[in-house]
Amino acid sequence: MIEIDLTSFVIITLSLAVGLTGGYYGRRFLAESRIRTAEEEVAKMLDEAAKEVEAKKKEILLEAKDEIHRNRQDAEKDIRERRRELDRVERRIIQKEEMIDKKTENMEKKEQVLLEKEKETEKTQQDLQMVLSQQLKELERLSGLSSEEAKELLLYNVSQQIRQETAVLIRNIENEAKEEADKKAKNIVSLAIQKCAADVVSESTVSVVPLPNDEMKGRIIGREGRNIRTFEALSGVDLIIDDTPEAVILSSFDPIRREVARVALGNLVSDGRIHPARIEEMVEKARKEIEQEIREVGEQAAFEVGVHGLHPELIKLLGRLKYRTSYGQNVLRHSVEVAHLAGIMAAELEVDIMLAKRSGLLHDIGKAVDHEVSGPHVEIGVDLAKKYRENKDVIHGIEAHHGDIEPETVEAVLVQAADAISASRPGARRETLETYIKRLEKLENVAESFSGVDRTFAIQAGREIRIIVKPEEIDDLHSINLARDIAAKIEQDLDYPGQIKVVVIRETRSVEYAK
């Protein structure tokens, strides 16, 4: 039993050994077989790759050969074309050279002909010179004049004739130009006058204030005339109370004073309370109202003309012109009219319309303060325009509008013409009123020339002048001497009919407030 088991064990062991050995060699055989197969496949792949590389190499070589062949053909074609172009250029050059040779030959022939003609001309000139010399000698012998003398005589006669003909021609041209210019100027001026229709209002030196009843006259006069004296002293106007029913008259050559007095008196009559303190309050209030109105009037005038950007002080001065007259003509309306006329004529001549209007509006601006500042209104206007930085052409228009200097611009000439047109219209001005006003202004200016004078008022149609002095500078004794000195200067400087009463008023006020 044990032997059987041992035999079985040996058999099994041998079987296992044989199986393992066979398995080992079988697997080794399979592995070697696979390796050989893989090596064969690799060799095959390498062979195929080598064949493909060889084929690709041949293909690339063929393409390169084809490219080289094509490039060679293109280069040969380009060379052939360039050669043909060079041949054409060469043929043209040869043709041009042949033409140049022909022209050179022709030029040489012409030059030869010219030389021959030049010789002939020189010979002819010599012959002519000889003939001329003989003729000159013969003429000198016959006329008794040398050639230089004859030349001078001939030139003198010709120059005189040309000068005479030129003078006639210039005179004719000047006459034609003047006629044409006059015709054109008349057309422009007539057109400007037709387009500009301005109102003419004759200014007066009196204003009438209506009253509710005649009893109001007594209240205006006041106790012992204190109200009327206070009113006249503060306003600087004459208050005339006569038999005119329900009305009193304010008389003054200064329209601004008269307007202030009219407004103040109207307010006093409406209020009903009339006494010195109230009169002073109302006069001051009226002055402020008139100042505001002056500003508004100036703005309205500038707006009406279409002039913008004026300095506020120039606007105020324009408004003051409403209360200023020149030979009876309202200066503000005159200035607006001049601006319109100058603008219309500038439009016709195609020059600067706004410059012409601005110069026309401001040309008489000096008249707004000429009774306060010494000197002609033109110089005052120029100084004001410079002070408020107006354009130099506007300043020139103001300076040239009365012909004090020669106008250098077309606009300045137009302002000058417009000023003359506005002033020369029938009924626009009255000489008598202006002369009267100027006499009163001179009367006030004489009094104001003394130191210590605060305000002056010429009243009673210039037969009386009231001088309000500064009490801190002029005492009572000095007031007497001042009145005498002013009267003497008036006698010396002014011509006037009759007598002028000089009244010096000195007032001292002490004001305290109870708290």
Swiss-Prot record:
Enzyme type, top EC level: hydrolase
GO cellular component, one term: plasma membrane
Highest taxon of the lineage: Bacteria
Main localization category: membrane
PROSITE patterns: HD (PS51831), KH_TYPE_1 (PS50084)
GO molecular function: RNA binding; RNA endonuclease activity
Keyword tags: Cell membrane, Endonuclease, Hydrolase, Membrane, Nuclease, RNA-binding, Transmembrane, Transmembrane helix
SMART domains found in the cross-reference section: HDc, KH
UniProt keyword Glycosyltransferase present: no
Domain KH: 205-290
Transmembrane regions listed in the UniProt entry: 6-26
Domain HD: 331-424
E.C. numbers: 3.1.-.-
GO process annotations (BP): mRNA catabolic process
InterPro entries found in the cross-reference section: HD/PDEase_dom, HD_domain, HDIG_dom, KH_dom, KH_dom_type_1, KH_dom_type_1_sf, Ribonuclease_Y, RNase_Y_N
Record membrane topology: Single-pass membrane protein
Compartment annotation: Cell membrane
Matches recorded under HAMAP family: RNase_Y (MF_00335)
Function as written in the Swiss-Prot or TrEMBL entry: Endoribonuclease that initiates mRNA decay.
Family: Belongs to the RNase Y family.
Protein name, entry field: Ribonuclease Y
The organism of origin for this protein: Syntrophomonas wolfei subsp. wolfei (strain DSM 2245B / Goettingen)
Designated gene of the protein: rny
